[in-house]
């Protein structure tokens, strides 16, 4: 059967998600785990594919892959035990015939987290609305010969604790597009730019692209296929890994705060 799996990962210890010889990647680890439990031998024959690639340092909450296997139950029940701690499956589905995780997606949603939250959240949210609709995003991405036009379905900026969150949904995105959009919105939040600048960049595309925000704030948040995924229990190993990362970064944040000079900006 063709099995679709939804999974999550921390991106900071991977050289991106796409398989690359000699480098640790999400796809490489996932395929190796599938081979170890013998749900398939050759990823090409199994037609292994993911919904899309993420760059080095970018995280995913709901990435999706699919592959052909005669042992779907083994994949569902065992895969989390053999995957490394920074990748874990969260759901499975038997998709309809002709399903492809990349081309069957109705929409994709990303979130970019800003810390500390800029002061002008309302202005950022208003500016984010300018992105909605179909536009030429040449100023916000490297199209690499692809059509630079994309249709943004929804965009908003809101507070979540001490963070500002930029959430954007589209049918598809160009390379580094969300991170460059985040850069401009952060400038709006600090008062260095405004919605009119975004309107200009969309109306008058330029080869001098906006710089990309750092990858660690970006999460592939969700992908909509119009189908329901059945839950998969997270493995104890990944649960411990998540708890360990939370403790580590909480302590590091405290240390950075205590070690910073008194005239620090944060």
Question: What is each stretch, according to the model?
Answer:
Residues 1-266:
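Structured-RNA-binding interfaces characteristic of tRNA pseudouridine synthases
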